[in-house]
A protein has these predicted regions:
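Catalytic core of non-heme Fe(II) oxygenases with the double-stranded beta-helix
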Residues: 84-153, 157-159, 165-169
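Non-heme Fe(II)/2-oxoglutarate
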Residues: 1-83
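Acidic-enriched, low-complexity/disordered segments with a strong bias for Aspartate over Glutamate
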Residues: 8, 21, 38, 58, ...
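Short loop segments at secondary-structure junctions
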Residues: 15-16, 117-121, 178
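Short peripheral tails and domain-boundary helices/loops at the edges of structured domains
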Residues: 167-178
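Generic ordered-secondary-structure signal
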Residues: 41-57, 64, 93, 113-121, ...
Length: 178
């Protein structure tokens, strides 16, 4: 796990068993096709609601508690352990050639995550926008099994996918409960 230099963006690799659980959960969500209700102007074409497996929830919440002093120091929210962290909802994204995700943020949560299930080489990059500057995160085949975690008020976007093949990712919002 590491923070991208000079940012609050954490990159971490999921344990193999957690990644396998996420692959299975995303396959079920894609099969069930329960539409995730993102605004049409911000959404890619294929987004489906899904339930994250307990193994993933336990892992990511513990990781956030250990890695981010953000909520403890910057906002004076005193939490010890994961009991106050909660994934409010999650969804699977399926990107095809030409798809993109317009700049947006997640106002009703504290953290956001995007974990990569299946990618192609030279896939559409993920960008963070701050002070009219972009921080690019390249996504490629080696991104599979990795997750980006960051404060949800950071504006982010996915550029148009120019490669053939699908990119499957799972996204979600995390809140801190009182």
């Amino acid at each position: 796990m590491r923070f991208l230099e000079g940012t609050d963006i954490l990159v971490a690799e999921m344990p193999k068993s957690v990644f396998a659980d996420m692959q299975q959960a995303s396959e079920i969500a894609i099969k069930n096709k329960i539409t995730h209700n993102d605004p049409a102007e911000a959404s890619i074409r294929q987004e489906y609601s899904m339930q994250c497996p307990n193994s993933f929830s336990d892992w990511i919440l513990l990781l956030i508690d250990h890695a981010f002093e953000f909520h403890k120091l910057r906002y004076g929210i005193a939490t010890e352990g994961t009991q106050n962290l909660y994934i409010t909802h999650s969804w699977v994204n399926v990107m095809e050639k030409g798809d993109q995700h317009y700049p947006h943020m997640h106002e009703n949560s504290f953290y956001y995550f995007s974990c990569y299930i299946s990618c192609t080489n030279d896939d559409a990059p993920f960008y963070f926008i701050k002070d009219n500057k972009g921080t690019k995160v390249d996504i490629n085949k080696s991104s599979e099994g990795h997750v980006l975690i960051f404060p949800s008020q950071m504006i982010h976007t996915v550029y148009p996918k120019k490669t053939d093949g699908q990119r499957v990712s799972v996204s979600g919002n995390i809140i801190i409960r009182p």
